[in-house]
């Protein structure tokens, strides 16, 4: 049986990860630690001799810069890259910009955990004048305004991630291309839930670490055979 490998990576630690703030669609860069994580991920993929055909990121710089660093380590900076908003992090609505501990004080631990981890619960939405809306940006100028979120559940995130996966990424995998996708904790959780056919409760406790390659091995019909994190 022929095995096709796809690599999923959550971006390296961002500055707001470090500061313990809800980030969502806010375009913050990697921290120094995040750049180091991306470099290590690239070195690890080089050790296992990965050669990619296509790369995908969100339109947020923490994923773009992570992939740049990885490809530099692999000497594959020529790789065609698609940057798409559908792979963006979940939009955290009115939580964006808040320190997570302060949010817990305001809303309560159980409520915050439900908003963060459940499949269907949506955090409070923000309005078009909110400082941390994240969508009032030139990169989204060609997207219909009513398409852009102002607060999402994981389910709503999956509703944009999975159709893109099925339409654009799956055919590439089916044609035996090696793909690398650098995305976000929740966009990757959405893909993982879809590929592994997890029910809503099973996704609750799944956490995606920053900067560690997650390898999916598929058969010829794009059915997952196994998945694992790459290690030293």
Curated annotation (Swiss-Prot):
Its job: Catalyzes the interconversion of 2-phosphoglycerate and 3-phosphoglycerate.
Family in the record: Belongs to the phosphoglycerate mutase family. BPG-dependent PGAM subfamily.
Active site (UniProt): 11 (tele-phosphohistidine intermediate), 89 (proton donor/acceptor)
Cross-referenced CDD domains: HP_PGM_like
Gene: gpmA
MF terms (GO), sorted A to Z: phosphoglycerate mutase activity
Keyword Amino-acid biosynthesis recorded: no
Protein name listed in UniProt: 2,3-bisphosphoglycerate-dependent phosphoglycerate mutase
Species for this entry: Blochmanniella floridana
Pathway annotation: Carbohydrate degradation; glycolysis; pyruvate from D-glyceraldehyde 3-phosphate: step 3/5
Catalytic reaction list: (2R)-2-phosphoglycerate = (2R)-3-phosphoglycerate
Keyword annotations from UniProtKB, A to Z: Gluconeogenesis, Glycolysis, Isomerase
Residues involved in substrate binding: 10-17, 23-24, 62, 89-92, 100, 116-117, 185-186
Family annotation (Pfam families): His_Phos_1
EC number: 5.4.2.11
Subunit structure: Homodimer.
Domain of life: Bacteria
Matching InterPro entries: His_Pase_superF_clade-1 (IPR013078), His_PPase_superfam (IPR029033), PG/BPGM_mutase_AS (IPR001345), Phosphogly_mut1 (IPR005952)
One GO BP: glycolytic process
Site (Transition state stabilizer): 184
HAMAP family reported for this sequence: PGAM_GpmA
